[in-house]
A protein has these predicted regions:
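N-terminal auxiliary segments of SAM/dcSAM-dependent transferases
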Residues: 1-23, 33-34, 38
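Conserved SAM/SAH cofactor-binding pocket of Class I
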Residues: 43-127
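Class I S-adenosylmethionine-dependent transferase superfamily signal
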Residues: 74, 144-145, 172
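Short beta->alpha hinge that forms the Motif I/post-I loop of the SAM-binding pocket
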Residues: 87-90, 137, 160
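A short glycine-rich, Lys/Arg-flanked "PGG" loop and its adjoining helix->strand segment in the class I
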Residues: 139-151
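Conserved beta-strand signature within the Rossmann-like core of class I S-adenosyl-L-methionine
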Residues: 152-160
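Conserved class I S-adenosyl-L-methionine
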Residues: 160-177
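Core SAM-dependent methyltransferase catalytic element
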Residues: 184-196
Length: 196
């Protein structure tokens, strides 16, 4: 089976719609084959969406956005945000744009291998890391996030604590010299580090 962390998925494109209740609102999304969690909102993304820290007018990066479920849910709840979506997967970029259009929202969507095509700095980076793509990649995303956060900006990462999340939180502590666990649900935890 093809991995979703790939630039150009080879699987046949099959688009469908799903619904999820996120931030107390039912939201519809287009999903497609070749992306992560296409049949329903995954538990990690739900935790990140419902418990992340967001302030009005913030610049937000949804890193590894997939079909855009995290960033779209946040943007629908707070249209004042300046949101950027990014994913290596061209199909993810296509579906995120389709979902923005579905909800009459505007945001920047960038196809990028990690931070390669991202120049801006953000108040927060939201990340449900592609753990099945490997620990080294996830560590690189954490390390590179530091250089793309404003002063006092925050990295908000969700992961299954007993399936690699513990190691990712240690890496965040190493990179940022601080870590907070702010929420947990169904084995997932939300870890937050602040750029000094």
């Amino acid at each position: 089976m093809e991995h979703y962390f790939t630039k150009s998925p080879k699987s046949e494109l099959k688009i469908k719609k799903i619904k999820a209740v996120l931030r107390s609102k039912e939201i519809e999304f287009y999903t497609a084959s070749g992306l992560f969690s296409i049949n329903k909102a995954d538990k990690g993304s739900k935790l990140l969406i419902n418990k992340c820290i967001i302030k009005d007018n913030w610049k937000v990066l949804d890193l590894g956005c997939g079909y855009g479920i995290i960033g779209l849910s946040i943007l629908i709840a707070n249209p004042s945000l300046k949101l950027t979506f990014s994913d290596i997967n061209e199909r993810a970029v296509q579906l995120t744009n389709k979902n923005l259009k579905l909800h009459n929202l505007n945001a920047e969507v960038i196809q990028s291998d990690c931070f390669k095509n991202i120049k801006d700095k953000f108040n927060t980076i939201l990340l449900n890391p592609p753990q099945t793509a490997g620990k080294e990649l996830c560590f690189r995303l954490i390390e590179d996030s530091k250089h793309h956060l404003e002063k006092e900006g925050i990295l908000q990462l969700v992961a299954r604590h007993n399936k690699g999340g513990k190691e990712l939180s240690k890496k965040m502590k190493e990179v940022f010299n601080n870590i907070k666990e702010t929420a947990k649900s169904a084995g997932y935890r939300l870890y937050i580090s602040q750029n000094p």
